[in-house]
Amino acid sequence: MMHRTLLRGPWCRQEVILPLRTITSASKLRRPFPVPSSYKHNPRAFASVSYLASEQPSHSTSTEGKEISSDNEPSKPTSHVPWYLQEDTPVSDSQISSRDQIPDLPEDPPAILSPFLDYVFRDLGLDELKLIDLRGLETPPALGANVIMIIGTARSVKHLNVSADRLCRWLRSNYKLSPYADGLLGRNELKIKLRRKARRARLASRSGVMFDDKDDGITTGWICVNAGVVEESPVLEKDETFEGFGKVGRGTRIVVQIFTEEKRAEVDLESLWQGALDRAEREKQKYSEVTRNAPPEEVRDSNSIYLPSSDRESGKVHRSTVSLLFEQKRHFHSTRPTGHPNGRENVDSVARLMASEPPSGRLAHGDVFSAGISTYSLFQYLEGLPSEAARHELGTGPEDQGSTLFLQLFFNRLSTLSAEKSTVARVKLLCMAISRQHPAYSKEGLWTAFMRCTASGYHVSDDLSFDVVSTLLTESPPDDRNSGSFSPDSDRELAVRVLEHLSLRGTNVLNMKVLNMLHRATSTASPEVAQRISRIIKTLDLPFDADHSRVLMATLFQNQDYNGFWKLWRKLPLTNSPRTGADYEMLFQLHAELGDELRARDCLSTWVPMMAREETPIPLQGRLLQHVKQCLVVADPDIEQSAASGATSDLARIWNECQRNI
């Protein structure tokens, strides 16, 4: 009450009102401040200056009086609508920005794509959606083939993780797919990491230390959701003219790349894939021009290609008129073709021609064709020669093309072949020369020839490529600095480069054949390196291959990995690969060469009786008998005297059996 009295008191006095009159008279032309209608109806509202001035004698103009009278008129009642009941005005399509639109569907889209985009846009709330059709592009194996990629922007790190998690759950529940998200943190894991980060920030603020944990495992800013195959393509009938192998990728995949705004600008994934699409389009146009300008027919040399039985039965081989660039072609292989009917005859013809060397030492081109000689028969003839004779036939080096009759035959034959076949045949010749330890042929020259062949776009078969790797890993002949054979690190580096090239072009290099070559190359290195290769073989869990496993068994035994040897030995019958006489020959020969008395004794007493219990009983005869006798001498140097004196031990019994089978 006291405060109200103090406030009302001065306003009732005349000396307080008089100064206000002078102020009002000095500002007659000022418009009164409009007062809201709610305050006008309140009788206890604070009075304004204009209201006090209106109580004095009228000094204002007529217009001012009209305005005051109009303000005092009662306002018409209006209906008030709350904001939550007001209807939103529809927004035209022209006012919607590009970041608020669903991208257009590509040609021949899968049925799931339209609801997929609608869910990503409306329910997940991703912005700036971009759809890239990569179905005509060779994508990385991690993404798969026939990919439709969708790129979107999340509004925060939390929105990023929640959107990816909800998308995976939606695909599992609605379409029974099995998506996987790279970079996604689970709900509980994200909460735990955020809680720990907040705790570290509080501790840092209390101690006065700046908290800057950029790499916290949360703010990656990028999650890749691979929905997998969303639509299986129809199974087409097998093309009878198709030549090749491998699994054809069928079906369409959808991959969603979700970024934060900063990470999307940093990675710029759209530009990278658009550049790949542009390059593929240019290559397609270039190949179409090559096909259009190609000759209508292909001229083939009948002597350079072996026709299989299926081609010989038809009498006529139907060849495509398309350029060789797109056609499946038969190339030179390092291994002998299966069932080659004239292989032995061609080798015999080469041998007869070599025996009847002309006195001049030079050979005419017609003699090569009349003898029916091919590069395959020449290589088969060279493989059958001893190492010393083979080195003599290879001449003085890679530049020598006529010092021996073999080189004359070989290079005369190359002059009739195409540039691709001629280059591949030279690579094979280098492999054979280096494997026979010819001092004039270098591994650096082989590496250069191989890379020149691949850089020219020529097709080098996997068999020949693995031969190049095996040749690079062979031991070099002795020189001035090394008294014995050796394998320098530079050769191993070249072999690894060839394997990297094969891996980049899609060849499977993680197989028993390659690991056997690597294991054999590390036999001269430290035992730790060889054991590392053995651990890699165990870790990869490769499919069991009986032939390569037998080669690996011998390498493991020679590298003193006896446990690995016995594991593979016992695994043979369990993989439908029964032990043969050659396996037992290898077993007893390895123990005889090892010279360990205890191991030889244990091997004889255990596995000689097992020979008769095999699925196909193995008789003790021939080379096997000789290896068993050598192993008996290692186990007991006096075995012959002990058996003659009537000893009844297991070794004496085995010796007597060997003597009876001689």
Curated annotation (Swiss-Prot):
InterPro entries: Atp25, NT_sf. Its main location: mitochondrion. Residues 52-63 have a biased composition (Polar residues). Residues 284-301 have a biased composition (Basic and acidic residues). The keyword DNA-binding does not apply. It is a peripheral membrane protein. One of its GO terms (biological process) is mRNA stabilization. One of its GO terms (cellular component) is mitochondrial inner membrane. It comes from the Eukaryota. Keywords: Membrane, Mitochondrion, Mitochondrion inner membrane, Transit peptide. SUPFAM superfamilies: Nucleotidyltransferase. Residues 1-46 form a transit peptide. Residues 52-83, 284-313 are annotated as: Disordered. It is found in: Mitochondrion inner membrane. Probable mitochondrial mRNA stabilization factor. Belongs to the ATP25 family. PANTHER family: ATPASE SYNTHESIS PROTEIN 25, MITOCHONDRIAL. This is ATPase synthesis protein 25, mitochondrial. It comes from Aspergillus flavus (strain ATCC 200026 / FGSC A1120 / IAM 13836 / NRRL 3357 / JCM 12722 / SRRC 167).
